[in-house]
Amino acid sequence: MNFNLKEAIEILEHTPQTLEKFLSGLSEGWLQCNEGEGTWNTSEVIEHLIEAEKNNWIPRLEFILQEGKGQAFPPFDRYAHLHKESTSSIEEKLLEFNMIRMQNLQQLKLLIKHEKLLEARGEHPEFGEVKVRELLSTWVAHDLTHIAQIVRVMAERYREDVGPWEEYLGILKK
C-alpha cells in the first residue's frame, strides 16, 4: 500500500493552486470546450469539484467516523452541478473551490488524529464496506483524474488544428 496521509494532503492542498494557475484568465473558448455530447467542459469540472467538496469527502468521512459500517452513507450525486445555473466567472469558481478545500483540509486534520482511524470502516451505498484510507486515496485520485480530464478536453479543442502532428500527441489518442 502506498497511502500516506501527509502525501495525500500535499496533493489536496496543491490542486486549487494548480487549477488557478492553469485556468485563471483563459478565454471562454478554452473554458467551454468539451469532448462532445454528454461530456463536461472545464467550468463544469470545476463546478463538480466544488460539489464534491461540499457533499462528498468530508461529509462521508464524518459519517464513517460517527456511524461506522452499520448504515450506508448517503449517495453522492456526481451530476448535481449540471442541474444548477451558474453565472460565476472561472475565477470566482476557483476561489470558492479553494476556500472550501482549505476548510475541508483543516477538518480532515482535526478528524484524523491518529493512523488507526485510517482503518475505520463505513458502508458505501454501491461498493459496500470501505475504509477511511480508501476514501482519502480516492479523494486524491479524483483530483488527479479531473486535472487530467481538463488538460485532455483542452487539447481536444485543437485536434483538427494540429494536422499530421496528431500522430505524436498521446493526449489526443485517449
Show where each model-derived region lies:
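Hydrophobic faces of stable alpha-helices that mediate helix-helix packing
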Residues: 12-16, 54, 101, 108, ...
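Short acidic/polar alpha-helix capping motifs at helix-coil junctions
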Residues: 8-11, 23-25, 68-71, 85-87, ...
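Amphipathic, non-membrane alpha-helical segments in soluble helical-bundle scaffolds
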Residues: 2-12, 39, 43, 90-94, ...
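Alpha-helical bundle segments that constitute or directly flank the non-heme di-iron/ferroxidase center
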Residues: 2-30, 51-63
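Acidic/histidine-rich alpha-helical segments that form the ligand environment
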Residues: 78-119, 134-142, 149
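Basic/polar N-terminal segments that are highly enriched at the extreme N-terminus
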Residues: 1-3, 173-174
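Charged/polar positions within long, soluble alpha-helices
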Residues: 21-24, 28, 62, 66, ...
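Short, contiguous alpha-helical
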Residues: 32-76, 122-174
